[in-house]
UniProtKB/Swiss-Prot annotation:
Binds 1 lipoyl cofactor covalently. This is Glycine cleavage system H protein. Transmembrane segments: none annotated. It comes from Vibrio campbellii (strain ATCC BAA-1116). Pfam families: GCV_H (PF01597).
């Protein structure tokens, strides 16, 4: 697992891209709980997302799960690959399975998220 990632209690991850944007996806643990992903409902570019608010929906063979934004900002890119290949979320949750890139409104929000170590210990307790 990439140690630069930050995580939420609802199993989303964030990667600070170092240019005022951040990439968001769901964790390996989340995709394992969901099972085979069959559809991802993506937001539109220029949509505003708010920390703690749902911005996407991932449907699997088992369930549909809202995806919550860990940060506030504006969607600057969506992963269009997921429209044809939603299984990328299962195969590469931290690489090809990213969901959106967001221009950060408040970079300090990243400080409120768990680092990889904290996240891993929290899911071991579940």
């Amino acid at each position: 697992m990439d140690k630069t990632l930050k995580f939420t209690d609802s199993h989303e991850w964030v990667r600070d891209n170092g240019d005022g944007t951040a990439t968001i996806g769901i964790s390996e643990h989340a995709q394992e709980m969901l099972g085979d992903v069959v559809f991802v409902d993506l937001p539109d570019v220029e949509d505003e997302v708010e920390a703690g608010e749902s911005f996407s929906l991932v449907e699997s063979v088992k369930a549909a799960s809202d995806i919550y934004s860990p940060i506030t900002g504006e969607v600057v890119e969506i992963n269009e690959e997921l429209e044809d290949s939603p299984e990328l979320i299962n195969e590469e949750p931290y690489e090809g399975g990213w969901i959106v890139k967001v221009k950060l409104s408040d970079p300090s929000e990243l400080d409120d998220l768990k680092d990889a170590e904290e996240y891993l210990s929290s899911i071991e307790e579940e």
